[in-house]
Amino acid sequence: MGIKVQRPRCFFDIAINNQPAGRVVFELFSDVCPKTCENFRCLCTGEKGTGKSTQKPLHYKSCLFHRVVKDFMVQGGDFSEGNGRGGESIYGGFFEDESFAVKHNKEFLLSMANRGKDTNGSQFFITTKPTPHLDGHHVVFGQVISGQEVVREIENQKTDAASKPFAEVRILSCGELIPKSKVKKEEKKRHKSSSSSSSSSSDSDSSSDSQSSSDSSDSESATEEKSKKRKKKHRKNSRKHKKEKKKRKKSKKSASSESEAENLEAQPQSTVRPEEIPPIPENRFLMRKSPPKADEKERKNRERERERECNPPNSQPASYQRRLLVTRSGRKIKGRGPRRYRTPSRSRSRDRFRRSETPPHWRQEMQRAQRMRVSSGERWIKGDKSELNEIKENQRSPVRVKERKITDHRNVSESPNRKNEKEKKVKDHKSNSKERDIRRNSEKDDKYKNKVKKRAKSKSRSKSKEKSKSKERDSKHNRNEEKRMRSRSKGRDHENVKEKEKQSDSKGKDQERSRSKEKSKQLESKSNEHDHSKSKEKDRRAQSRSRECDITKGKHSYNSRTRERSRSRDRSRRVRSRTHDRDRSRSKEYHRYREQEYRRRGRSRSRERRTPPGRSRSKDRRRRRRDSRSSEREESQSRNKDKYRNQESKSSHRKENSESEKRMYSKSRDHNSSNNSREKKADRDQSPFSKIKQSSQDNELKSSMLKNKEDEKIRSSVEKENQKSKGQENDHVHEKNKKFDHESSPGTDEDKSG
């Protein structure tokens, strides 16, 4: 077991923006890495002077913390430049990595900063979290013992992009903390050194003497004896000092013991006689049987003996003596129980006012009865009280008679004058009570009469009020009935108007439904026709292609004709598609117009509810006229469309017939062409291109003339049909207007009468 060496400790007094933040104390692991710890300790104390390379004091005082990374570490120790590029060790420049034994496995560890392997200078860092990735790269040589909150405060400072804190975190002062035990040892060493110096001085004196008397041996022996004597004296003095110390200690102990004894004497002592101490009771809780009866008999005998000693044989017992009482007059009262009488005093005149004749128990009963009577009188409200009071007095009178008899028996010495006075008092009391009862009854009768009168008045008033209320109710009821009748008549009129509107709406809806059905049928027929025409066109194109292939062998002229025919057909189809598109656009516009009319009708209906019935009727007439006109227009348009379709179908039949004739003609031409093939070959050899051009030009002129004629015919037929439809519409409108005029005349008369 080796002696545990005390680890060195250093401190930093830190200021943030020149305001003291606190002290941080470090413990250095000098047993693990002594060289690194010595470097840090000397830089804290500043005892090594200036550096060799930096030429600045090797001291951490007024040094900055130049790098702060939250949740990682706090770095400082660059005393030369203050930005992490400077610093120097006490050994000059850098020194090697000493030991990686201690790991970065916890927070608040003190470790050396470096630029790589074996580049330790003066810069250090304090970890704020475990950093195991630094193990094997940085030497851990200490830890923070106190001041962790100061390190946290430095860590929480705001920094720039280079992790430099905006606030100035500076080490105000630093140094080494020396424990007290070391200080005491150093003082002892100093004392020893001083004593050794004194002894050396004495030795020097003796040596000088010996040098002076070196010639004689006697002087040497004398010096030796002197030194021995001094040692003996020193020993004696030390022994005396020890003895004196022991005596002082003993004297102190004796003084303390004496003071304790005085305190004990001053305290009061309790004196108890041994006779007074009761005997310790026996444990009888385990005894199953009851104790013997002999003891009980002995106790009874002892009690009897004590009573005999207290009461001699001639004297009466104590219980009887206690019962004997003496009155004021000196009479002895004998008997048991409480006293029921007493002797009257000699002076009756005084006693009359002081005390009553009745004994105390009778007085208590009387007071109880009086209380009950008073309370019953207060509680009774209705009816007469005279009978009840008389019954109570009759009940109480025998009690009073008994009282008199008892007093007559017991007080024989009472005089007749006193009896007369008592009778007078009783009579006066009875008369007074009767008078009170009579007064109370009379007052109650008066009150009852007044109440009856008030009730009668209130009843008469209530009857008059009820009559007036009933009249008001009747009048209100009549008014309400009149209002109801009016409202019912108005409601009926309104319902009639609504029914008419509903009928008109239903008619309009039916017409619209029929129109929509017709339109859907027309669209279906159109789509079918379109599909049929497409299929026909495809067949025709296929036939025309096959014909063209046959004709191209020797008939360029016939090919040009077929092309012109196909072009004319395409143009006619385009014209049809245009007309179809126009019809569709017109139908869309018509649908929009119908939707707008529906919206206007909805608004007009909401207005009609507010407006009077006369205006609503006039609006209904206008709407009917508009609906009739629109329906006539639709019918005329539908007729025109049907006619146009019939014409188109006829024209298509004609074209098909003409095409069939042309096919027959082309077949006959094919037979003739075989005979004249030699002549045509010769013509082709002469000028084939010129002949083809001439034939194509002629065909184009003919086809254009035919198309123009067909277009003029179609236009003229459409115009005639439009004129006819317009004339029919005008006739129909005139007829409807006449009908509406006939129908509207009674409605206007009704409005005038209303």
Curated annotation (Swiss-Prot):
Residues 292-310, 348-368, 379-449, 463-553, 578-599, 628-686, 707-754 have a biased composition (Basic and acidic residues). The RS domain is required for the interaction with the phosphorylated C-terminal domain of RNA polymerase II. Keywords: Isomerase, Isopeptide bond, Nucleus, Phosphoprotein, Rotamase, Ubl conjugation. SUPFAM superfamilies: Cyclophilin-like. There is a cross-link at residues 392, 693 (Glycyl lysine isopeptide (Lys-Gly) (interchain with G-Cter in SUMO2)). Residues 11-176 form the PPIase cyclophilin-type domain. Pfam families: Pro_isomerase. Residues 182-193, 228-253, 329-347, 450-462, 616-627 have a biased composition (Basic residues). It is an enzyme of class 5 (isomerase). Residues 194-216 have a biased composition (Low complexity). Interacts with CLK1, PNN and with the phosphorylated C-terminal domain of RNA polymerase II. One of its GO terms (molecular function) is cyclosporin A binding. PPIase that catalyzes the cis-trans isomerization of proline imidic peptide bonds in oligopeptides and may therefore assist protein folding. May be implicated in the folding, transport, and assembly of proteins. May play an important role in the regulation of pre-mRNA splicing. Inhibited by cyclosporin A (CsA). Its EC number is 5.2.1.8. The modification Phosphothreonine is found at residues 358, 748. Ubiquitous. The lineage of its organism: Eukaryota, Metazoa, Chordata, Craniata, Vertebrata. The gene is PPIG. Residues 182-754 are annotated as: Disordered. One of its GO terms (cellular component) is nucleus. This is Peptidyl-prolyl cis-trans isomerase G. InterPro entries: Cyclophilin-like_dom_sf, Cyclophilin-type_PPIase_CS, Cyclophilin-type_PPIase_dom. It is found in: Nucleus matrix; Nucleus speckle. One of its GO terms (biological process) is protein folding. It catalyses: [protein]-peptidylproline (omega=180) = [protein]-peptidylproline (omega=0).
